[in-house]
Curated annotation (Swiss-Prot):
Pfam families: adh_short (PF00106)
UniProt protein name: Short-chain dehydrogenase/reductase prx7
Species name: Penicillium rubens (strain ATCC 28089 / DSM 1075 / NRRL 1951 / Wisconsin 54-1255) (Penicillium chrysogenum)
EC number(s) stated in the UniProt entry for this protein: 1.1.99.-
Binding site for NADP(+): N23, N70, Y150, K154, V183, T185
Pathway(s) annotated for this protein in UniProt: Sesquiterpene biosynthesis
């Protein structure tokens, strides 16, 4: 999906594009194929890698307009497996679970958002008009039974996006998350994809088109966006939105309604301005 977005941006001559990837060979080849595109190695689970990439970009261009936090992996081990023991007296703790999906899919997004806000705010526009789009998943809205760690990370992305969006928006930065259904990427192998309903796959070009609409503030640019149900969000409301994408269209997904007014008051009190000097250090 990241490649599809890069290709779509490369067709618009006013974009300088940076691709970050852990696969140096693939990233370098892609950068050669696309105009105005630079590759920078980065393991998104390592803050120093991401910081170096952002710094290199900013030193070269002096501004940042859009960031697509898209890198992701899924767990390859069975969370539900139970190692066998000779008898109940020989039972030992199981090996520590492998957590690459938590590290890449959630921690990597947190690092990316943290760096994005810094360089957005140091750009000439001081953040106004900046766009950060995060890749969550349908597994961030519904339980993904065979990949609970991936699902936990993607639920985390949606919650993280909603939590930062208001404060980012105060600086003019729009933060949104896409929650696609199944898209044939390298997330799983062909046997894995074959276990899903064959008629429900989404083309990567569909994802890229929606991402660019979020970046542009709608279609036409700046006019807001209308989902498949006909619900329209004007530009000034097009932030903090989780956009679910299926093979049939895309849908704005609201956060849960408050159980009562008391809970609304509690959560309203968490705005950053209330907590600086209280819970937060200045």
């Amino acid at each position: 999906m990241g490649l599809a977005v890069a290709k779509a941006l490369s067709l618009q001559k006013d974009w300088e594009i940076y691709i970050l990837d852990i696969n140096s060979e693939r990233g370098a080849e892609t950068a050669k194929e696309l105009p105005r595109t630079t590759f920078h190695y980065a393991n998104v689970t390592k803050y120093s890698d991401l910081a170096a990439a952002f710094q290199s970009m900013f030193q070269q261009h002096g501004k940042l307009d859009f960031v697509f936090a898209n890198a992701g992996v899924i767990e390859r081990t069975n969370f539900y497996s139970t190692p066998q023991a000779e008898n109940d007296m020989d039972v030992c703790p199981p090996p520590e679970p492998d957590l690459p999906s938590i590290d890449a899919d959630l921690k990597g997004v947190v690092f990316t958002a943290y760096l994005a806000q810094h360089y957005f705010r140091h750009s000439p526009h001081r953040g106004h008009g900046g766009s950060l789009v995060m890749t969550a998943s349908c597994g961030g809205l519904y339980p993904s039974f065979y990949s609970p760690l991936y699902s936990a990370a993607k639920f985390g992305v949606v919650g993280f996006m909603r939590s930062i969006s208001q404060h980012f928006h105060a600086s003019g930065i729009r933060v949104n998350a896409i929650c696609p259904g199944i898209v044939r990427t390298n997330l799983v192998d062909s046997a894995g994809w074959d276990s899903f309903p064959p008629g429900r796959f989404i083309e990567v070009e569909t994802i890229a088109r929606l991402v660019l609409q979020l970046v542009d503030g709608g279609e036409p640019a700046g006019r807001g966006l209308t989902d498949t149900t006909g619900r329209h969000l004007p530009l000034e409301e097009l932030y903090g939105v989780a956009v679910e994408i299926s093979d049939s269209g895309f849908y704005f997904r609201d956060q849960h309604t408050f159980c009562d007014e008391g809970m609304r008051e509690v959560m309203d009190a968490t705005v950053v301005e209330n907590q600086v000097g209280a819970v937060l250090n200045g």
